[in-house]
Amino acid sequence: MSVKVINSEDFANAVKDGVSVVDFNATWCGPCKLLGPVLEKLSYEITDVKFYAMDVDENPDIAEKFGIMSIPYVAVFRDGVKVDQNVGFIPEASMRSFIEKNK
């Protein structure tokens, strides 16, 4: 699997079933650029979770809905409900643990 880019219109449908990880980011964000490849790699290794990315500048309504003030902001959703979030860059092993504990 890979990280699929979604927008505000896709969001509710994307996260409604199962476990989803959403990487809220922006093109100008340095730590976001570092985190992207980590999540891409994990998307191939943690196959029972869906991975998405959303640009907060292009989708400010969703960023506002979740009170996102800092990025990267990675949220785990289970059946459409946010169960946890992480703000800032964390290394691969820590991100894997964060995702696994919230599945």
Feature map (PLM): residue ranges:
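N-terminal "domain-start" segment that seeds a small globular fold
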Residues: 1-13, 50
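Short active-site neighborhood of thiol/selenol oxidoreductases, capturing the structured segment around
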Residues: 15-25
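Conserved helix-turn-beta segment immediately C-terminal to the redox Cys motif
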Residues: 19, 36-54
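Conserved redox-active cysteine motifs that mediate thiol-disulfide chemistry
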Residues: 24-38
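Structural microenvironment flanking redox-active thiols in thiol-disulfide oxidoreductases
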Residues: 56-63
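Structural micro-motif
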Residues: 66-75
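Non-catalytic, surface beta->alpha helical segment in thiol-disulfide oxidoreductase systems
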Residues: 78-103
